[in-house]
């Protein structure tokens, strides 16, 4: 079992539950997120658990991979980066939206429910006033 964790507390809980490793995922990731940045979260989790830590969230190239290893991660997970791959069979409209997105083109919704989620800004999100 390798769960995704957004905090040190959850990483410790997953280790006690028998996880083989944890994926420490920062707020830069796409989809459901925690509140800690990847580069702050990873070394804290590394220091708190004895199992391998895999870094995730906002890692898109060799610099992010190298930084993750320098912070003690034993591996990295890249997600959004691969949405643009030819092999990825997502909707082409969404794929183009992700590829063309700039650094200010994402928005976090769901904070008021306790379930924050990073999304690409769209007309739909502006219409529902999230």
Regions found by a protein language model. Name each.
Residues 40-54, 60-128:
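Conserved active-site-proximal phosphate/metal-binding subdomains
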């Amino acid at each position: 079992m390798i769960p995704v964790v957004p905090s040190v507390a959850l990483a410790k809980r997953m280790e006690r539950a028998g996880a083989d490793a944890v994926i420490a995922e920062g707020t830069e990731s796409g989809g459901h997120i925690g509140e800690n940045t990847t580069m702050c979260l990873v070394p804290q989790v590394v220091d708190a658990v004895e199992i391998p830590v895999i870094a995730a969230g906002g890692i898109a190239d060799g610099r992010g991979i190298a930084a993750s290893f320098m912070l003690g991660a034993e591996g990295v997970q890249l997600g959004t980066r691969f949405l643009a791959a030819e092999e990825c069979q997502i909707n082409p409209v969404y794929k183009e939206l992700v590829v063309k997105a700039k650094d200010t083109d994402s928005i976090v919704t769901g904070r008021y429910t306790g379930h924050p989620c990073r999304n690409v800004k769209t007309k739909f999100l502006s219409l529902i006033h999230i």
